[in-house]
Swiss-Prot record:
The gene is HPRT1. The keyword Phosphoprotein applies. Binds 2 magnesium ions per subunit. The magnesium ions are essentially bound to the substrate and have few direct interactions with the protein. This is Hypoxanthine-guanine phosphoribosyltransferase. It catalyses: IMP + diphosphate = hypoxanthine + 5-phospho-alpha-D-ribose 1-diphosphate; GMP + diphosphate = guanine + 5-phospho-alpha-D-ribose 1-diphosphate.
Length: 218
């Protein structure tokens, strides 16, 4: 692993970790290939991202916008770290939260047909520093759609934090402002990332097996 502006870069030949080295729910034992990013590493990286966010955005009211459903764990943990920094700083700022749901996946493919559910009234974003928190950037089309929607409400600033960015030839070239990990073009689950709503209850980010894909296929 190496570190650069795109976060912790996980190489294409990263072997991951054997499942039996971690506590994995028994009902998923045959459905995963390996643990890709252990929970502890996720938390340590998230703590640093919180500091980076406050450094760039901490001078004005922040509205943290969570992209559901996959982003909720990263959102909650990132905000916990941000709140800790905020309450221990002489220059603390107010922070509010909002939620939006986007749907673009069926099975393991981004459909390109992006549905926005919720977020009908985002007028509260006007004049605010908006931090959009997402679980994963795949092609980037979903985030481009959301950014267009958010910018209609004239926020003062918009930044995007994504736990994961996938290296894929399908990418439109969009890169978020804050990145936890840059990963190979593999379908990952866990830490609230799902495959047809399954695997959100895993603590670690894992690579799904072909058995798992077949079992939970829509």
């Amino acid at each position: 692993m190496a570190t650069r502006s795109l976060g912790v870069v996980i190489s294409d030949d990263e072997p991951g970790y054997d499942l039996d080295l971690f506590c994995i729910p028994h009902h998923y034992a045959e459905d995963l290939e390996k643990v890709f990013i252990p929970h502890g590493l996720i938390m340590d990286r998230t703590e640093r991202l919180a500091r980076d966010v406050m450094k760039e955005m901490g001078g004005h009211h922040i509205v943290a916008l969570c992209v559901l459903k996959g982003g909720y764990k990263f959102f909650a943990d990132l905000l916990d770290y941000i709140k800790a920094l905020n309450r221990n700083s002489d220059g603390s700022i107010p922070m509010t939260v909002d939620f939006i749901r986007l749907k673009s996946y069926c099975n393991d493919q981004s459909t390109g047909d992006i549905k926005v559910i919720g977020g009908d009234d985002l007028s509260t974003l006007t004049g605010k520093n908006v931090l959009i928190v997402e679980d994963i950037i795949d092609t980037g089309k979903t985030m481009q759609t959301l950014l267009s929607l958010v910018k209609e409400h004239n926020p003062k600033m918009v930044k995007v934090a994504s736990l994961l960015v996938k290296r894929t030839p399908r990418s439109v070239g969009y890169k978020p402002d804050f990145v936890g990990f840059e990963i190979p073009d593999k379908f990952v689950v866990g830490y609230a990332l799902d495959y047809n709503e399954y695997f959100r209850d895993l603590n670690h980010v894992c690579v799904i097996s072909e058995t798992g894909k077949a079992k939970y296929k829509a």
